[in-house]
Amino acid sequence: MASEDPSVSGVSGRYATALFELARDEKSIDAVTADLDKFSAMLAGSPDLVRLVRSPVFASEVQGKALAAVLDKAGITGISANFLKVLAANRRLFVVADVIRAYRALVAKFKGEATADVTVAEKLSDKNLEALKAALKSVTGKDVALNINVDPAIIGGLVVKLGSRMVDSSLRTKLNSIKHAMKEAG
């Protein structure tokens, strides 16, 4: 399955595929997804956790013990916790964000959903998220799972990547277009 989908290739794809197949066999796809979403949110909110995950300075034992404490406090148990501990033991914790992204892609494919990567300048409200999902569903004919990335550098608007298609309606791109047009005219 991983070889068919370019979004789940490489080391992260192999780990994501293994986790997905285990979760599917144990009928716990939704529980694992919820745990990974929780861990992903923890990463987004904690620079210290990001350092622990990404730094090669920490030995795998140190990473494993610290990770076990974090997972215990967050209430992440079972398949998800064991999987994250395996990543730490195998010195692959630095790819956890890519593994989570690839896992989500596998789950979306399994459920017949499309996945869109959306970059926005600031966090979207729930109302705007639902409107975006509805607009993308009307285009694809499928339910669309969103991977939201907040990047203030785009200034405003959004960038949507859905499969091989990309729509860049960011203010940064529009300003760059105006800048280039003015250079050509002047």
From Swiss-Prot:
Membrane topology listed for this record: Peripheral membrane protein
Pfam families on file: OSCP (PF00213)
Major place of residence: membrane
PROSITE patterns found in the cross-reference section: ATPASE_DELTA
Subcellular location: Cell inner membrane
Function (record text): F(1)F(0) ATP synthase produces ATP from ADP in the presence of a proton or sodium gradient. F-type ATPases consist of two structural domains, F(1) containing the extramembraneous catalytic core and F(0) containing the membrane proton channel, linked together by a central stalk and a peripheral stalk. During catalysis, ATP synthesis in the catalytic domain of F(1) is coupled via a rotary mechanism of the central stalk subunits to proton translocation. This protein is part of the stalk that links CF(0) to CF(1). It either transmits conformational changes from CF(0) to CF(1) or is implicated in proton conduction.
The family this protein is said to belong to: Belongs to the ATPase delta chain family.
Subunit architecture: F-type ATPases have 2 components, F(1) - the catalytic core - and F(0) - the membrane proton channel. F(1) has five subunits: alpha(3), beta(3), gamma(1), delta(1), epsilon(1). CF(0) has four main subunits: a(1), b(1), b'(1) and c(10-14). The alpha and beta chains form an alternating ring which encloses part of the gamma chain. F(1) is attached to F(0) by a central stalk formed by the gamma and epsilon chains, while a peripheral stalk is formed by the delta, b and b' chains.
HAMAP family membership: ATP_synth_delta_bact
Protein name, UniProt field: ATP synthase subunit delta
Gene: atpH
